[in-house]
Amino acid sequence: RFIFGFEESYGYLAGPYVRDKDAVIGSMLICEMAAYYRSIGSSLKQRLEEIYAQYGRYLNKVDSFEFPGLSGMDKMSALMQGLRDKPLTEIAGHAIVKVTDYQKPEETGLPAANVLIYKLDNGETVVVRPSGTEPKIKIYYTTLGKNLEEAEAEKEKLAEALKPIMA
């Protein structure tokens, strides 16, 4: 059963009611949540802070590395192939416990794509993929801390460890 889905550019789907991502369904659900929490003397922000206190603070960030000029696409391709030929074993001191290579549809059950996902020993993830429209490689980080500052510091450690690879 599909519950919800969303994307980086703020498209949102909830349930089977709407078949294309838009802001209308997300706005409606936020209004319903706000009304509910107000009816019990709370607020969306207050409830969100309670969730953070219970589960920690997840952070999702993206870094982009540009590869301009005629040689940019070749550099990007070589970089992605290099990550496949000599797989990373750790990032910023965190062991990589699983690598999912989306160029292997037999592993994912999905169509082939030039995407690598690294699952770290602390539950964080790092996703590396070339942009489909620009001469860039994007790295997506999902980190967790007790608070936002911890999650941001963890993201920065991972980013610093990966910068030399993107040079």
Q: What does each model-found stretch correspond to?
A:
Residues 1-129, 136-138, 147-153, 159-167:
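Phosphate-binding and adjacent anionic-ligand microenvironments
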Residues 142:
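Active-site beta-strand/loop architecture of penicillin-binding DD-peptidases
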